């Protein structure tokens, strides 16, 4: 189908029961698991369980869409885990910067632009190599809700674009720098 990502979703893992992502997975016949952090003795044990599930499903790439819980990234998944952040990293990011907190911080600081960042996940919050960013202007009369809505629109373009680039083999990582080989002209 037009606009479809050139990927196969093999598993959905959630850190909360009853979330919309699990419903979407069920409707699409994608296997899912709910792994509650409280059921594990430590963050490391929780991370092992998450990535053991990914390995068992033969996942080549892990997408942390809406997964706010910190999870240690094992060496065999280095540069194979991606996330999106609702600001232009390295600004307005790190521990505690998620959801509307990010947008309110952008407004409180008086920033003129915001946006979103798709990045590889490493073992620090919002720190991994940046794959791509989209800029969103901050309007003088913005509220956190209004800015969040515009940033979300940008996220809905950026995340699939980044995933498609990775799936096509167009992305390589050299230290902190992500190189994107030209495929088709990007909008």
Where in the sequence are the language-model features?
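One-carbon transfer enzymes
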Residues: 1-187
């Amino acid at each position: 189908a037009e606009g479809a990502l050139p990927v196969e979703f093999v598993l959905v893992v959630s850190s909360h029961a009853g979330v919309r992502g699990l419903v979407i997975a069920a409707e699409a016949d994608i296997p899912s698991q709910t792994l509650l952090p409280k059921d594990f003795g430590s963050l490391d044990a929780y991370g092992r369980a998450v990535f053991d599930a990914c390995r068992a499903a033969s996942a080549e790439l892990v997408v942390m869409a809406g997964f706010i819980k910190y999870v240690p990234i094992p060496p065999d998944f280095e540069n194979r885990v991606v996330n999106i952040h609702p600001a232009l990293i390295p600004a307005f990011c790190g521990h505690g910067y998620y959801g509307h907190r990010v947008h309110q911080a952008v407004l409180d600081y008086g920033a003129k632009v915001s946006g979103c960042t798709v990045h590889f996940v490493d073992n620090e919050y919002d720190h991994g190599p940046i794959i791509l960013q989209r800029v969103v202007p901050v309007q003088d009369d913005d509220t956190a809700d209004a800015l969040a809505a515009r940033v979300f629109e940008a996220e809905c373009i950026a995340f699939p674009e980044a995933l498609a680039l990775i799936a096509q083999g167009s992305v390589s990582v050299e230290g902190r720098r992500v190189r994107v080989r030209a495929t088709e002209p990007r909008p």
